[in-house]
Structure formats: C-alpha cells, structure tokens
C-alpha cells in the first residue's frame, strides 16, 4: 500500500466516490477513529459515500483488513460532527476520519449475542465489559483490521 496524490494505492483499496465533500483539508494533525455500527464494511462505506447522507469519512476498514477510501486526505470529511477537543472546535477541519467495521454494542439472549440489526455474533467475537455493576457486550475488532489501521496511521 502506498500514498499517491492524497489517496491510498494498492490491491486492498476500493475507492468509492463521495462527491459531497469539497472543502480542502489543509494541515490535518489528528486521526479520529470510530466504529461503524453497521452490518458490513461495504454497506457502511456505501452509506457514508451516499450524497444524501450528512456524514462521511476518509476511510472504512473492514474486518479482513480491506480498505474503502471515500474522501482524499486533502479534503474535509464529515465524521466528527459538532466536536471539541483540547480547546479546538470542529475537528473535521483538522482530522482524518477512519471508520472500523464493527457492530458496536450487542444484546445477549441466553448464550447468544446479537447486533442491533439481528445478526448473531459468535462468542469469540464478543468483548464483555463490566462497569458500575452492569455487564455490557461489544463486538471486538479483528487482528487484520487493527494491523491495517496501524499500517495506515
């Protein structure tokens, strides 16, 4: 994988046109990482690239490490919303947005785990969190996904 003219190049990269983003991103100095909360990397990338959708991201990284680039790195993506961090507002103006394909919070029924959209997740892909005397269950990230993220960053 290489970087050429603000886009990633390589066999593992799929580019989707996201024509709604046109403002220049001058000097990004921050990376904002999100979970998609979707059913797949491709469906999340297509949703984010859709002209009618009010959000976008530079990249979506799938569970096998595949990459979807929606917005070049020299163009502002709309991934951080109305944000503030360390005294700065509107982080979209300073940051690259990367989405990791992940179902997010899961629901347990007996010994099974399900996404918000009804897909069953195997127990080996579930992280259990215990806070304030309450259990919650989350979809884990995959090793290929995290390796790709590290390589990109």
Language-model segments: residues:
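Active-site-adjacent loop/helix surface patches within enzyme catalytic domains
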Residues: 2-153
